[in-house]
Amino acid sequence: MTSGGSTRADVGIEGGRIVAIGDAGSASRDLDAAGLLVLPGCVDLHTHLASTPTFTPLDDFEHGTRAAIAGGVTTVCSMVYQEGTLRAGIERGLRDAERSLADFAFHVVVTDPTDAAVTELPSLARDGHTGLKVFMVTPRFGDRITDYVRLLRAAAAAGMLTAVHAEDHETVARATTLLHAAGHDAVRYFPESRPAAAEDIAIRAAAELAAKTGAAMYFVHLSSRVALAALAEAKSRGLHVYGETRPLYLYLTRERFERPDAALWVGQPPLREREDVEAIWNALRGGLLDTVGTDHYPHLRAAKLAPDLAFDRVPPGVANLETLLPMLYSEGVRRGRLTVERVVDVLATSPARIAGLRSKGEIAVGKDADIVIFDPEHTRTIRVGEMHSACDYDPFEGWEVTGWPMITLLRGEVVYADGEILAQPGQGRLVARDPSQGARS
């Protein structure tokens, strides 16, 4: 399967790359995929597997990529955080990723857009690093907008992608203050603290910055109808912008926040209305949205459900890597919302193209042999005890899914088969961005 169609053929692999598609002839080893789908390994451009000086994620590179390869995700892009210099953040990420079971790349979160940070970008681009990330939801972004404009111009000149967390700080801060003043501290008020208007305002402001600076922007975790409308307007202007949604917004609504365990679904932005869910499916089907990224960042159940936490103190994030592909196939293809080709596009081909990861995302001669042998008829119920994340709950616990990865190959090596992790920590490699591809492709 490719994003352009399907064919019945052998796939020949040698030296970790695809060398033939068709009649591959004799081989030293055969994998029988008769009756199954042969898909390219998924590329997730949005994970949080790297540590910071003060925090180590529950799913680090080892645990997170165990879940990834079990779910057919062979390349992960993790956020790393500036530590004085941007390169110091990348170096920490490289140390963390020494135990990765999947291939990996980084986005550097820029928290202090100094002149020195700006001057680092050309060398980072030459070294093949994919891009940056900025958080519009922090007060720092507005306070230092002149510095961020300079950063965006430099990123554009270097051909780097800028991932954007697009929620307007003032809108979120005002809503949060009003809720606390009214004594509405409970987690069920979380959706009201981050209204969809915050996305709308931020995306439109970011689009103006993209027009001003020439920056290529990748809007992460879009959750609402108004966010989609703002993205559509930016694209209609010919700006270099891309849109990502995440699994939570495809399957769940804010009704989860009426439950006693509402905190388990706290993520930023929050879950929205049923109309938003349907709009996101339409945007994914029609091509307005380019990718689905997990924003994988789980926390233990006890940490999420601590009784003394107000809505804005609950640690945000959930586990999604292992269920990314099977959920999208089951809820998308099986329900007639998406074609298999479109699933391949949004989970593999487009993410690789957008990030400039030339060797990834396609089953084609010359590409890395990152392959998922997928059984479209295999039905299973999601149970946390069967998942490979270190998290002790799953946001889709009890969900019946039809379609599941049976075998995952990373650069031609079988790293997962029939429920067993076969890869070793450290098997993953850094994937360099191709300077001729990526942000403006």
What residues fall within each predicted segment?
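A glycine-rich helix N-cap at a beta->alpha junction
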Residues: 95-110
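C-terminal cap of metal-dependent C-N hydrolases
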Residues: 306, 310, 365-431
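Divalent metal-coordination and catalytic microenvironments
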Residues: 11, 16, 35, 46, ...
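His/Asp/Glu-enriched, well-ordered alpha-helical/loop segment
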Residues: 186-216, 264, 286, 290-292, ...
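Metal-associated gating/positioning segment near the N- to mid-region
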Residues: 33-99, 116
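Short, surface-exposed connector motifs at secondary-structure boundaries
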Residues: 72-77, 101-105, 131, 209-217, ...
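Histidine/acidic residue-rich metal-binding segments in metalloenzymes
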Residues: 116-136, 140-292, 309
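N-terminal metal-binding scaffold of metallo-dependent hydrolase/deaminase domains
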Residues: 1-26
